[in-house]
């Protein structure tokens, strides 16, 4: 049996992070978790690029532009979309998830979805480094593993 899997060694990998400025009090914690995890796994600080955009809705376009340049092994998306009283939540969540998935499939570059989609601010805070771990850190680990896996295929 031939088993192909990625490892968690980040040395030599180039990773882009696209983060929404909206709800940045949550996004900042996600970013800190992602960057710290990338560095702990050997990604050089100079090989981490961070692009800020106004909100989560704009993330797919920024991801597309970064992916088209072909300079990164993986892209991490970070942000927080919190449900409100209107249907805006569904519009943004669907646009982000389908947009980044399309870029990933079209380019072959792994795009990790670290945009929190929660019903409350409390849930978002929990997933940004308190009770429920840090989704930014989790995405960083997955980005390293996917980049290394794809290098073997």
Swiss-Prot record:
State the species of origin. Answer: Herpetosiphon aurantiacus (strain ATCC 23779 / DSM 785 / 114-95)
Which protein is depicted? 6,7-dimethyl-8-ribityllumazine synthase
Gene that encodes the chain = ribH
Pathway involvement of the protein, from the record? Cofactor biosynthesis; riboflavin biosynthesis; riboflavin from 2-hydroxy-3-oxobutyl phosphate and 5-amino-6-(D-ribitylamino)uracil: step 1/2
What are the binding positions for (2S)-2-hydroxy-3-oxobutyl phosphate in this chain?
Answer: 85-86, 127
Q: Where is the active site?
A: 88 (proton donor)
Which family does this protein fall into? Belongs to the DMRL synthase family.
The molecular function terms in GO held by this entry are: 6,7-dimethyl-8-ribityllumazine synthase activity
Report the EC number(s), separated by commas if there are several. Answer: 2.5.1.78
Q: What does this protein do?
A: Catalyzes the formation of 6,7-dimethyl-8-ribityllumazine by condensation of 5-amino-6-(D-ribitylamino)uracil with 3,4-dihydroxy-2-butanone 4-phosphate. This is the penultimate step in the biosynthesis of riboflavin.
Name a single GO cellular component. cytosol
GO BP: riboflavin biosynthetic process
Could you list this entry's UniProt keywords, alphabetically sorted. Answer: Riboflavin biosynthesis, Transferase
The residues the record assigns to binding 5-amino-6-(D-ribitylamino)uracil are 22, 56-58, 80-82, 113
* Pfam families noted in UniProt: DMRL_synthase
